[in-house]
């Protein structure tokens, strides 16, 4: 037995998986449309994708994008357990069935369209790299609580239509494993894995930034991207945040206000009773405790009390008093920011 090499692998896959690929004219048109797209992208994609030979590779690999077959054959195929051609055929058969069942429209089957939420497909990858990567996929790439699909949903527009964040995360995952040394990918490669007609090329860099900010196992270094089973800084910070108590947040807020309030007013932070605020001609700024942010009625009641009373009597210099209270949404955002700040300091 001698392994299949080069363009020959595309022919083997075509014959094994499909009895009939339809009109050859369609195949050539699809190859030409991708080739035209790649000419427009210039240096944003690998140089070989702009060569005539690459258009021919697309024709040979149709309906798969050659990049998908290459990453499976060259990277995943380097695992002794993968069985190269057999492994590629097994995986692609599952991928085709999944796309057919989901009625996903695309001229070519690209890496970004591989559905890692499909358990049969997922198992084909996991069995070569270890069960610990189940949690990586579930946290970041595919599943009801995964972060990449949530980014697509929250961003809407092209993100939601084409599954941009999920597609990029999936493509990077496929590039992250190999029996050899290379275990990452680059932005130009990611564009090849994702872009097709209708997807703006500029969205890729923006989406990568969002993955870097929000995913837990997505690692980037010197414009190289990969998934690892070690958490990145985002996850470390989230773990630290869980140890930060509400009391500590409140104490930090008190300390920050106290050190930044200036001298234009006499400042009174979170007074409990009216007698905590003197009745004199000095300008006074009163900040109500954060607890009042969630109870506007009680907040108004307490502010009125401070205006009316001073100790056991009535307040004379009401016009020197200013009372501020946080709104609940403001305090919620402020608390989140302070929690993250304290977590980073640890």
Model-derived features: where do they sit?
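Extended alpha-helical scaffold and adjacent linker segments that couple domains
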Residues: 1-346
């Amino acid at each position: 037995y001698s392994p299949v090499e080069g363009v020959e692998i595309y022919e083997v896959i075509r014959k094994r998986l499909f009895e009939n690929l339809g009109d050859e004219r369609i195949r050539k048109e699809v190859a030409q449309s991708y080739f035209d797209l790649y000419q427009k992208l210039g240096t944003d994609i690998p140089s070989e994708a702009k060569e005539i030979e690459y258009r021919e590779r697309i024709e040979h690999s149709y309906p798969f994008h050659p990049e998908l077959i290459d990453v499976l054959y060259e990277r995943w195929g380097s695992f002794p357990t993968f069985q190269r051609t057999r492994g590629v055929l097994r995986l692609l058969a599952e991928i085709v069935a999944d796309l057919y069942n989901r009625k996903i429209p695309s001229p070519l089957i690209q890496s970004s369209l591989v559905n890692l939420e499909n358990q049969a497909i997922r198992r084909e990858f996991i069995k070569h790299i270890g069960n610990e990567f189940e949690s990586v996929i579930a946290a970041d790439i595919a599943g009801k609580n995964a972060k990449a699909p949530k980014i697509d949903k929250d961003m809407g527009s092209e993100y939601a239509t084409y599954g941009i964040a999920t597609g990029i995360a999936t493509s990077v995952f496929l590039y992250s494993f190999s029996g050899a040394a290379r275990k990452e990918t680059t932005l130009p490669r990611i564009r090849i894995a994702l872009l097709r007609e209708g997807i703006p090329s500029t969205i890729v860099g923006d989406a990568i930034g969002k993955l870097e900010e929000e995913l837990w196992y997505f690692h980037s270094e010197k414009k190289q991207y990969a998934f690892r089973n070690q958490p990145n800084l985002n996850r470390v910070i989230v773990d630290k945040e869980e140890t930060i108590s509400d009391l500590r947040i409140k104490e930090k807020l008190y300390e920050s206000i106290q050190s930044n309030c200036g001298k234009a007013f006499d400042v009174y932070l979170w007074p409990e009773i009216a007698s905590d605020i003197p009745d004199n001609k000095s300008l006074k700024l009163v900040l109500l405790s954060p607890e009042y942010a969630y109870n506007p009625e009680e907040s108004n009641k307490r502010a009125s009390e401070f205006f009316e009373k001073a100790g056991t009597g009535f307040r004379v210099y009401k016009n020197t008093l200013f009372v501020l209270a946080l709104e609940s949404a403001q305090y919620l955002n402020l608390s989140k920011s302070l929690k993250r700040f304290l977590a980073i300091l640890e």
